[in-house]
């Protein structure tokens, strides 16, 4: 199973933007507690929320799918 590091990426992007969890929560209309749970990995981030956060931070998000050459890994 693949694991993602969305929580770590989110923390990094907030630091790079100089924003606090409280500030981003206010900007996207969610609670500080919710953002905190996401960044600590205690709650799965919803795609809609992730997209709002990345939009506020000035990022375009692209999702790509690439077919594996080795089908035995599926």
For each predicted feature, which ranges?
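A short, Lys/Arg-rich alpha-helix, primarily the initiator
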Residues: 1-17
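Recognition helix of helix-turn-helix/homeodomain-like DNA-binding domains
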Residues: 29-44
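Glycine-centered signal
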Residues: 18-19, 36
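Short alpha-helical "recognition helix" segments of helix-turn-helix
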Residues: 24-25
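Short, charged recognition helix plus adjacent turn
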Residues: 64-74
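DNA major-groove recognition helix of helix-turn-helix/homeodomain DNA-binding modules
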Residues: 48-63
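Helix-turn-helix DNA-binding elements, focusing on the entry/boundary residues of the two helices
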Residues: 21, 32, 47-50
């Amino acid at each position: 199973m693949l694991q993602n590091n969305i929580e770590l990426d989110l923390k990094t992007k907030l630091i790079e933007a100089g924003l606090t969890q409280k500030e981003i929560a206010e900007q996207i209309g969610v609670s500080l507690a919710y953002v905190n749970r996401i960044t600590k990995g205690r709650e799965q981030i919803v795609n809609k929320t992730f997209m709002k956060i990345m939009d506020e931070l000035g990022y375009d998000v692209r999702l790509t799918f690439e077919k594996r050459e080795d089908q035995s890994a599926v």
